Amino acid sequence: MSSEGLMVFTGNANPKLAEAVVKHLNIPLGKALVGRFSDGEVQVEIQENVRGKHVFILQSTCAPTNDNLMELMVMVDALKRASARRITAAIPYFGYARQDRRPRSARVAISAKVVANMLEVAGVERVLTMDLHADQIQGFFDIPVDNIYASPILLEDLRKKNYDNLLVVSPDVGGVVRARALAKQLGVDLAIIDKRRPKANVAEVMNIIGEVEGRNCVIMDDMIDTGGTLCKAAQVLKERGAKQVFSYCTHPVLSGGAAARIADSALDEVVVTDTIPLRDDAAQCGKIRQLSTAPLLAETFTRIVRGDSIMSLFAE
């Protein structure tokens, strides 16, 4: 894989993913000190020449969200001042994406827009992310945004499993487009869970649209946070006669007691990617399995540098 003129740096959010990406690119990981001063302020020093290079900073803004976001901002500034030719922020998991609008004109921030502004002011010239929580966030930027998808990775794994009588389930109405695309590619039926959310991180399953009895159900979503909604959905699917229930999700946020909740749930398996490193309790959970996004990210980095099409990676 040609990677001439390309350099990859990382903060402390997901160094293992960065190491896997540069291994696929057959280049070393960029040398940088990303630490803290005694008072907790972020300290960054680029420790090699980046002049005239196309630099990618691979940094998910996952928990600790504010620390990882600030590391990214300070790294961008350090690279800009070191005369990098172009800076791409590769943010596999884009934090602060869940507040992307003002529902019913509520007095809330649009934090996704705030982060977009911060990245641009810092000096980012392109953003690369994966499975954005809301596609419209791309419009918050005045620079190019490439939102790629983990679907080829998840699809490949699903096809290897070769489940019979498969049914793709959307966890809510908002996820129907994603779930329908997966169902179409697999050539299977689609069901939808109709739910309402009275407050953040709390959802009540209302109804299931579609026949699930005797089916192997795959719940497709962009992220798992507390896992409460997912576990409740699996329980209802099993009560309606589902044979097995699997979940395929891109981002394993898995906050609070999510791993324990999944372990005790009706879910047979939860498959996630490595956009976010697994916490210790999640890594030890026998029901959670992680797939690598490194080959996809490495190929995307190369295509960006060459000026090749990225959309063709996902055309099917």
Curated annotation (Swiss-Prot):
Q: Which gene encodes it?
A: prs
Q: Which cofactor does it need?
A: Mg(2+)
Provide the binding site for D-ribose 5-phosphate: 197, 221, 225-229
Query: What does the note accompanying the cofactor annotation read?
Result: Binds 2 Mg(2+) ions per subunit.
Task: Return the protein name.
Answer: Ribose-phosphate pyrophosphokinase
Quaternary context: Homohexamer.
- Enzyme class, broadest EC rank: transferase
HAMAP family xrefs: RibP_PPkinase_B (MF_00583_B)
Where do the annotations place Mg(2+) 2 binding? Answer: 172
Please give the pathway this protein is involved in. Metabolic intermediate biosynthesis; 5-phospho-alpha-D-ribose 1-diphosphate biosynthesis; 5-phospho-alpha-D-ribose 1-diphosphate from D-ribose 5-phosphate (route I): step 1/1
**Cell compartment(s), UniProt:** Cytoplasm
- Chief localization: cytoplasm
Q: What does UniProt give as GO cellular component?
A: cytoplasm; ribose phosphate diphosphokinase complex
Which source organism? Ralstonia nicotianae (strain ATCC BAA-1114 / GMI1000) (Ralstonia solanacearum)
